[in-house]
Amino acid sequence: MLEKLFRLDGKIIVITGATGLLGRKHAEAVACYGGTPILLDLSQQIVDDFANELNAKYKVDSVGFEIDITNEKMIKGNVEELIKRFGKIDGLVNNAANNPKVEDSKKVN
């Protein structure tokens, strides 16, 4: 019964920060329930590799895009491309983080 309730067949779900720890789990859950995870992160190679993994395991049509969530122009261009390619966006998982405290902590020895 729960499986039927949570099915995402035919749904296009965009996931920012898709190759991080939680992003990967979100993408796998979307794919597992029949949705199409659209993977956004900072490295094209990494999102492509992850999309290929999801496609092989779950038989979905996942794709990835290199996107910097702090770049508004990139985001607008990506949305236009996604609408052109898929005709819609059904959901968004805002998983990417832009936390200067995290960046600063990397500099501390």
Residue locations for each model-derived region?
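Short, conserved SAM-binding/catalytic segment
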Residues: F50-Y58
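Structural signature of beta-strand start/N-cap positions in the alpha/beta core
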Residues: I12, T36, D61-V63, K88-D90
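Conserved mid-core segment of classical short-chain dehydrogenase/reductases
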Residues: K76, N98-N109
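Glycine-rich phosphate-binding loop signature in dinucleotide/nucleotide-binding domains
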Residues: L82-G87
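Rossmann-fold scaffold of SDR-type NAD(P)-dependent oxidoreductases
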Residues: T16, I89-A97
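The beta1-alpha1 cofactor-binding region of Rossmann-like NAD(H)/NADP(H)-dependent oxidoreductases
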Residues: Q44-Q45, F65-N78
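Canonical Rossmann dinucleotide-binding motif of NAD(H)/NADP(H)-dependent dehydrogenases/reductases
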Residues: E3-I38
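Conserved glycine-rich Rossmann-like NAD(P)H-binding loop of the short-chain dehydrogenase/reductase
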Residues: Y33-F50
